[in-house]
Structures are given as structure tokens and as C-alpha cells.
Design a protein with these regions (language model features):
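Conserved pre-ATP/AMP-binding loop-to-beta segment of ANL
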Residues: 22, 149-186, 193
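Conserved AMP-binding A3 loop
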Residues: 36-38, 173-175, 182-206
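Conserved AMP-binding/adenylate-forming core of the ANL superfamily
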Residues: 25-55, 60-69, 73, 77, ...
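Solvent-exposed alpha-helix faces
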Residues: 45-49, 103-106, 115, 192, ...
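Surface-exposed loop/turn positions
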Residues: 60, 84, 179-180
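A short N-terminal helical cap/helix-turn-helix that marks the beginning
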Residues: 2-26, 42
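Structural core segment of the AMP-binding/adenylate-forming
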Residues: 54, 81, 85-158
Length: 209
């Protein structure tokens, strides 16, 4: 690893995926579902294509709400390594709080568990281009061309882009310095709606040095 990359948060993950491709990365609690670093990197690559198809750009916000599992991890890491800003929403928040956070953060995409979507309507979150299920990735609601962002369309683009398969050598993520924003975290406030706290990449990098 080059000196300038030594403490870069995104480079941490880029190098970790490359160097630990066959090792176990995450397991869904209470199941036998375990993803290797290679499996996780592949899911991230497909999510990056989905972001592209949705027109997501650097510093756009992507919200994620649901219990911690491998899909939640995939969205979080895919967002940060794409160069976008992740907005994690506590799964215990009520629908009104989630709506406020999505709107206040100006998120463009929302990944949410099916149970957390109950009580939310697309017209309540007007800046959102598409909502995807964290359970199985199906589009719950969208304003975009469904043929461009269906899972089958994403797989077709993925297979065309990586005709020989996705390998460790293919892992290349966004170039972002640690002083740029990684996430906006909304805490459960004691009065009124929750407030957002900006977390730079350096704040996350400091936890894994």
C-alpha cells in the first residue's frame, strides 16, 4: 500500500477485498448465510451499477433503513466506496421520523426493509428516485424506468462489463480524501425530530487503523 493510501478509508476496503478475497467477511445472525470478501465485493459492484443506472453522482445521498444484516452492510459500503454519502436510519424510528430524515438529508435512493416501509408513501419523500427492498432487492416504488433498474438489467450490465467474471483485480473504488463526508447520522432526539451529524471518512478510518 502506498504511503498516501495508508490511512485512506476507502483504500482500506479496496485493499482488504483484494487481499482477503476467499476469506469469510460477514454472516447473517441466526442463519448459515456467510459472504466471503469476494461475495461482498461482487454485491457492491452490482450496487454500483444500480447507482449508475439511477443517475447517482458523487456526494448524492443514499438512505438505508433496516436491521443490520449482509444486505445492509452491502448498501453502506457500496454507497461510501461509490463516492456517495450514506444516510443510515435506525430501524426503530417511526415512519414520520424516517420520512423527515429522508427529506432533510435530500437522499436520492432509499433501501429499506419491507416492514419499515409500512406507513410510508412515495409522495411523502419527493426527492427519492427509487425505493428498494433490503429483503430481496426488488424495487418497492420508483420514478425511473423500471427496465433500466430491474435486477435482471443490472445483472446483464454486470455480465457485459465483466465477461470473464468479477475478480479481486477488478476492485477499484472512488478516489476520496478522508476529509470528505462519509455519512450523515441521525440520532434519536429527546425533543422534536432527530438531528443529523456529519461523519467524515477520517472519523470512520480512525476506528479501523
Amino acid at each position: 500500500m502506498q504511503n498516501e493510501e495508508k490511512y485512506n478509508f476507502i483504500k482500506y476496503y479496496e485493499h482488504s477485498f483484494r487481499n482477503n478475497w476467499a476469506s469469510e467477511a460477514v454472516t447473517d445472525y441466526g442463519t448459515n448465510v456467510t459472504l466471503t470478501y469476494g461475495d461482498l465485493a461482487t454485491k457492491i459492484a452490482k450496487l454500483h451499477i444500480l447507482f449508475e443506472q439511477c443517475g447517482i453522482k458523487k456526494d448524492d445521498k443514499i438512505a438505508v433503513m433496516g436491521k443490520n444484516n449482509s444486505n445492509w452492510v452491502s448498501v453502506y459500503l457500496a454507497t461510501v466506496t461509490y463516492g456517495a454519502i450514506v444516510v443510515p436510519i435506525l430501524q426503530d424510528f417511526k415512519a414520520n421520523d424516517a420520512i423527515h430524515i429522508v427529506n432533510h438529508s435530500e437522499s436520492k435512493l432509499l433501501f429499506i426493509s419491507d416492514i419499515n416501509w409500512e406507513g410510508i408513501e412515495l409522495d411523502q419523500i419527493p426527492d427519492i428516485l427509487a425505493v428498494f427492498s433490503l429483503n430481496d432487492w426488488h424495487p418497492i416504488s420508483l420514478t425511473l424506468d423500471p427496465e433500466r433498474i430491474s435486477m435482471s438489467a443490472i445483472v446483464d450490465v454486470f455480465n457485459s462489463r465483466y465477461p470473464n467474471g468479477y475478480t479481486a483485480e477488478e476492485v477499484h473504488y472512488a478516489e476520496r480524501s478522508n476529509d470528505q463526508i462519509a455519512s450523515i447520522n441521525y440520532t434519536s432526539g429527546t425533543t422534536g425530530f432527530s438531528k443529523g451529524v456529519i461523519m467524515p471518512l477520517n472519523g470512520l478510518a480512525g476506528n479501523i487503523r
